[in-house]
Curated annotation (Swiss-Prot):
Function: Target of the herbicide glyphosate. Catalyzes the transfer of the enolpyruvyl moiety of phosphoenolpyruvate (PEP) to the 5-hydroxyl of shikimate-3-phosphate (S3P) to produce enolpyruvyl shikimate-3-phosphate and inorganic phosphate.
Keywords recorded for this protein, A-Z: Amino-acid biosynthesis, Aromatic amino acid biosynthesis, Cytoplasm, Herbicide resistance, Transferase
Major subcellular site: cytoplasm
Active-site residue numbers: D313
Enzyme class name: transferase
Lineage of the organism: Bacteria, Pseudomonadati, Pseudomonadota, Gammaproteobacteria, Enterobacterales
Pathway the protein acts in: Metabolic intermediate biosynthesis; chorismate biosynthesis; chorismate from D-erythrose 4-phosphate and phosphoenolpyruvate: step 6/7
EC number(s) on file: 2.5.1.19
The protein's name in its UniProt record: 3-phosphoshikimate 1-carboxyvinyltransferase
Positions of phosphoenolpyruvate binding: K22, G96, R124, Q171, R344, R386, K411
Gene name per UniProt: aroA
GO cellular component, as recorded: cytoplasm
UniProt key word Secreted: no
Source organism per UniProt: Klebsiella pneumoniae
Chain sites annotated for binding 3-phosphoshikimate: K22, S23, R27, S169, S170, Q171, S197, D313, N336, K340
Amino acid sequence: MESLTLQPIARVDGTVNLPGSKSVSNRALLLAALARGTTVLTNLLDSDDVRHMLNALSALGVHYVLSSDRTRCEVTGTGGPLQAGSALELFLGNAGTAMRPLAAALCLGSNDIVLTGEPRMKERPIGHLVDALRQGGAQIDYLEQENYPPLRLRGGFTGGDVEVDGSVSSQFLTALLMASPLAPQDTVIAIKGELVSRPYIDITLHLMKTFGVEVENQAYQRFIVRGNQQYQSPGDYLVEGDASSASYFLAAGAIKGGTVKVTGIGRNSVQGDIRFADVLEKMGATVTWGEDYIACTRGELNAIDMDMNHIPDAAMTIATAALFARGTTTLRNIYNWRVKETDRLFAMATELRKVGAEVEEGEDYIRITPPLTLQFAEIGTYNDHRMAMCFSLVALSDTPVTILDPKCTAKTFPDYFGQLARISTLA
């Protein structure tokens, strides 16, 4: 297996221009495809997950022109539901941001489409979304295991009253919201259980509004979406930088700055993961905000005990930043780590112990006490981009670290290690 050994980093300082947000890129691509008119997306993320969405749209007959660096995309909208000419199978890798929204969008009209993906995708639950779509009339079959992809979709979603469980993934609600305006009837979506990762719903609502569709949001408990609508292209849309990707550089600044500035997001960002910077501030770092940047300067870091449900992806970065904080850090209410690219609670606990931390892994929390000195380790990445990026922070100590399968960062950030090296001074 390929590996990358990072030598100890004495200091980080500089500016990182963030690649486009994965969450925003894939939502914007789908809405642009469904909309009337042509949309030019700029700062689109070039990564595996976005390529899976682009390939699927292409197979569905959507016409787009992609620039040579794949960050500008001109999409010719279809002005309504996506219709496949014939029976089709779409392979979506391990891209939840393609699988879930497409599963809903392709239940509009009359298609015969199979959605499948990598082995791990077949372990990521989708039953709550399927249940909700079926309540709205969709014809969906599980081809292998009940409640998991691959799925066969044969249209039929007409709207009406649907209830969706919000406790596992906000992507199920996102998928329903984006498809519902194109259903023939109004859709009333009721949330069952606690809605996790709520800020991701705000991204969805913001993008729908950008494409001309407003949703009545009743305190995140009920959402009313008028049917028979059409998305309208906004013309041009700039995809903001990826706030989850920003977390590694901001944390590096907190641990070994200097000052690290990330551009492409700022105080008015639509992504909830910018709140990650508040957590670093709480731990003792200095954070400054601009319209188009966030900067983080080193501070004496202290442990925290916090509910991280609002920023599950960025919270992983706090788990490795905790290695550099005084005291025991507890991250709570993160059960949904278990249903991501890998079981992230198990993976994080296992790898943190390798570098010498004392770790308690709960069903939905993790408690981390750092060692006096970090130990050298080979870090398994579980084909999970965030594991690779999180554990690169170990090099901000006096100890090198080896990352196995470093190319798994291609899911969201192909040039991550290059960007980290650019702002690093080796010990």
